[in-house]
Amino acid sequence: MLFFLCFYKGFCTINPEEDPNNIVDEMLFEIRAVQREYAIKRELIFLHLQQANSLLQNAKTTDEKVDLLIQKDAFSTELEFLKNSELRDISKIRYIKGLQIIKLLYEKTLSLDHHFAAVSTLRDVNNISNPNNYPEFVEMKDKLKTTQDKRTGFDLPSLLNSNIYTSVVYSFVSMFTNTNTSKAEKDNGLKEVECILDFTLRMHNDLNTIYFETAFLQKKNENISEAIKDLFKEYTKPLGYTIGLEECRKGDDWDAIRKNLDTYLATLDKTLEDNSKLDAARNLQINLEFPVDRLLQFITEYNNFINEGVNFYEKFQIMLSSYENEKQCASKTPVEYSRLKEGISVTIEKFNTAYKPVEINGSKMKQLLYGINEYD
């Protein structure tokens, strides 16, 4: 059967930019294939049952009637077996595809962490938001210090000297009160740093906001990552698999899960063959099915986080684009600023494509998890 060829694809290497909705569609296709296959088998048995009923009505001898009743009972038993076998095959599909989704979403959280780390480096944000990190401003301060009146001037303590606001105020006060520097020298000095001061004073708060809110998103991503680890532990527990998701990924131990699943399914198949153990078989099937509420809860949590991330980064994009004198001060604007803008644009695109939410509506989820078709 075609769908069985796809069963173990979820254990192969996954690209973190793969769309989880493709996995959902594959799951839906495979479940429908199973349902069609078993529907054909049931139709054949129902046809045999109808024939047996027709023959039973016309049977004249006791032996004929007994034989036909035995046939009917065998057909009913076969129908029950088909029902349990169908549940078993659908449960297997759900389990493997669910594990594939878990694995993919974990890869996405790891990839997201790299994006956040690239934006939220405090050193980089501090470098472009504080004029004290610009050589031109440092040079101007040094000149003011060497030309100031030693009797009336004063030096800022190192702590205040590194502060953007006290450092700028001190520099302006020193410049205006410095009688050893000509007006032309002061004008030239201001001209050298005007774009630096304009950019840092206007963008300092916005850049810090971007840093701290990105750190907040990074923390939430860590929480999502921990939640999916817990889900994986709960998910593989019925198979007797005890290794955590992170260790499984690092050790590429997916084949061990496949072997545990094969063993579990072999036990289920053996139990299904014994009519006296149908309740036990049903329990084994239930344990293999998706932990529905837990999985739905996580998918909802992941989707909300991605949507929140898009909103945050679109706000960052607006904040960075709000610098009014960007064209006028293009030659003095730090290259890190342009890189930050580009990085945020790329991240927005990533959120909308590589990290986009898992689109599972109510009717689709019912069919995927319970085999219920809204058109049945």
List the model feature ranges, each with a label.
Residues M1-D376:
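Extracellular, luminal, or virion-exposed ectodomains of exported proteins
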